[in-house]
Amino acid sequence: MLASIIGGIFLIKVAYANPLNLPSYALLKPQIKEAYSFAKLEGDKLQDLPCNCGCMSDASSHGGRLHSRGLLDCFIEGDLSNGGKWDSHASECGLCYEDALEAKKLYEQGKTKEEIKEILLEKYSKLKFSEDTVYEE
């Protein structure tokens, strides 16, 4: 009986701590959780925004599939309400989840999707990428 009560309390705490039913890897850091929450609740705002980590041109980053929807594909494969599933890529890629959070902030400031797209493209236009990190030229 006691184990049943403790188990029930645990389930309530887990459900309360994760009301959006995010995958466990999305809960690793508060910023990652915020980015995955944004992708789930307002994914249309990430659709067509550029992903600048290079994963859009390398299908191996996403289980063999190339991006078709931009930054949104770093978080979600397909439509979650219609058989889609989460993608773990953004939980492991600071560029992806940080750009999603930057986009969220810019939307909150009243920027349009086109303005945000330009800001993200400009942000990386003067940088070069290596296998390990981003360097300023």
Residue ranges of predicted features:
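Secretory/periplasmic and organellar redox-cofactor proteins
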Residues: 1-46, 61, 104-137
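Acidic/histidine-rich, surface-exposed loop or edge segments in extracytoplasmic proteins
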Residues: 16-22, 76-87, 98-101
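Immediate flanking context of iron-sulfur cluster ligation sites
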Residues: 35-51, 78, 83-88
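Local cysteine-cluster metal-coordination motifs and their immediate loop/turn environment
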Residues: 47-61, 75, 90-98
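Residue-level marker of positions within ordered structural domains that often coincide
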Residues: 58, 79, 121
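Extracellular/mature segments of secreted proteins
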Residues: 59-74, 81-86, 102-104
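Extracytoplasmic/periplasmic, Sec-exported soluble proteins
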Residues: 66, 88-96, 108
